[in-house]
């Protein structure tokens, strides 16, 4: 079982990054791929999920994010991909607060989360998020420098998170009107537009 990988980022993709450690490249699915830059030295905390069709590595900027991922993944009706999509769509401190306060309607705004699953999240995790909320363990990632194809990368990432092409196309004009920003910031803005509906 792996705890974390420390090495050089060699690929940044809308859904994953590749980190090279001792000459081996590990593909890691992460909720915030654009928080990393090609060539950066990084430490990624990982969770290894083994299924019949193979092994997948999920990676996070902090140990606390990894713990939250595992808690979400343990909820009935939530798999690792759904847990990752939820974490990509929201600041983790705000997510923990929503779970603690039982905001079911808030949780149903995430892709693939209906009322039943949102209620299950609250039922299973309420009372277990207090430390995250009280101690404010979750911190904002450092801003990423803007790159030319940032908007297109962000739109691809939104598609990878489960949003349809129609939904992505609907918010594209709104994102184009915004000042130029990093792909990660475009993703956050885009998710804000998508969740408002």
Curated annotation (Swiss-Prot):
The gene is ruvA. The RuvA-RuvB-RuvC complex processes Holliday junction (HJ) DNA during genetic recombination and DNA repair, while the RuvA-RuvB complex plays an important role in the rescue of blocked DNA replication forks via replication fork reversal (RFR). RuvA specifically binds to HJ cruciform DNA, conferring on it an open structure. The RuvB hexamer acts as an ATP-dependent pump, pulling dsDNA into and through the RuvAB complex. HJ branch migration allows RuvC to scan DNA until it finds its consensus sequence, where it cleaves and resolves the cruciform DNA. Keywords: Cytoplasm, DNA damage, DNA recombination, DNA repair, DNA-binding. SUPFAM superfamilies: DNA helicase RuvA subunit, C-terminal domain (SSF46929), Nucleic acid-binding proteins (SSF50249), RuvA domain 2-like (SSF47781). NCBIfam families: ruvA. One of its GO terms (molecular function) is ATP binding. The keyword Cytoplasm applies. Homotetramer. Forms an RuvA(8)-RuvB(12)-Holliday junction (HJ) complex. HJ DNA is sandwiched between 2 RuvA tetramers; dsDNA enters through RuvA and exits via RuvB. An RuvB hexamer assembles on each DNA strand where it exits the tetramer. Each RuvB hexamer is contacted by two RuvA subunits (via domain III) on 2 adjacent RuvB subunits; this complex drives branch migration. In the full resolvosome a probable DNA-RuvA(4)-RuvB(12)-RuvC(2) complex forms which resolves the HJ. This is Holliday junction branch migration complex subunit RuvA.
């Amino acid at each position: 079982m792996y705890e974390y990988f420390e090495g050089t980022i060699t690929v940044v993709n809308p859904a994953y990054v590749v980190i090279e450690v001792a000459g081996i490249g590990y593909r890691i699915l992460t909720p915030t791929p654009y928080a990393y830059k090609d060539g950066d030295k990084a430490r990624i905390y990982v969770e290894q999920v083994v299924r019949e069709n193979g092994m997948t590595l999920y990676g996070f900027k902090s140990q606390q994010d990894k713990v939250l991922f595992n808690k979400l993944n343990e909820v009935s009706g939530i798999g690792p991909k759904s847990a990752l999509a939820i974490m990509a769509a929201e600041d983790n401190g705000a997510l923990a607060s929503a779970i603690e306060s039982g905001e079911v309607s808030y949780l149903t705004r995430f892709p693939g989360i209906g009322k039943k699953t949102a209620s299950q999240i609250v039922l299973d995790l309420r009372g277990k998020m207090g430390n995250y909320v009280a101690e404010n363990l979750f911190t904002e990632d450092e801003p990423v420098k803007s790159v030319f194809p940032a908007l297109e990368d962000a739109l691809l990432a939104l598609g990878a998170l489960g949003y349809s092409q129609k939904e992505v196309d609907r918010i594209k004009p709104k994102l184009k009107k915004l000042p130029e920003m990093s792909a990660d910031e475009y993703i956050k803005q885009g998710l804000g537009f998508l969740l408002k509906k």
